[in-house]
Design a protein with these regions (language model features):
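Structural signature of tandem-repeat unit edges
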Residues: 1-19, 26, 30-48, 55-71, ...
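Acidic surface patches and DE-rich sequence motifs
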Residues: 22-23, 128
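Short, aromatic/basic amphipathic alpha-helical patches
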Residues: 75-76, 96-105, 120-135
Length: 140
């Protein structure tokens, strides 16, 4: 898939930066990857494991998660295939359908960048989930 379009009259979904999201709750529904850098729009509040990612997907993608993202659901990320940039000073809340399975929402095997002043918060975010540690954590 190289192109998607959405009617401006669509009452349920909206498209911005090649991302389709549900208007009612800000759930990211689909991402069409056209370039290395994927900018998730600031209207997105939730990223879960149902998001459809299509297009130029590769190990060099950069996924920029805005501070507006308040919740991630297990298995949402691109695993080790992308570099993740969290722009929020506070990490999103992790939701899992199974108690104790929240660790599946942590991109600990990806290269991850977080704001310099929030590094300790993100380290704690991982540690609070079964004592996990980041393998490739950086700041910007």
């Amino acid at each position: 898939i190289t192109k998607i379009s959405l009617s401006s009259k669509n009452k349920v979904y909206k498209m911005k930066h090649n991302c389709i999201y549900r208007k009612s709750d800000g759930l990211l529904v689909a991402v069409l990857v056209k370039t290395k850098k994927i900018n998730i729009p600031s209207k997105i509040k939730v990223i879960d494991d149902t998001v459809s990612v299509m297009g130029k997907i590769g190990t060099r993608n950069e996924v920029h998660i805005p501070k507006s993202v308040k919740k991630v659901v297990e298995y949402w990320m691109f695993y080790g295939d992308a570099t993740i940039y969290f722009h929020g000073m506070k990490p999103p809340v992790i939701e899992s359908q199974y108690d104790g399975n929240e660790f599946t929402a942590l991109p600990i095997y990806n290269s991850v960048y977080v704001p310099k002043k929030a590094k300790k918060t993100y380290i704690k975010w991982a540690k609070d989930r079964d004592g996990l540690e980041w393998h490739d954590l950086h700041t910007f």
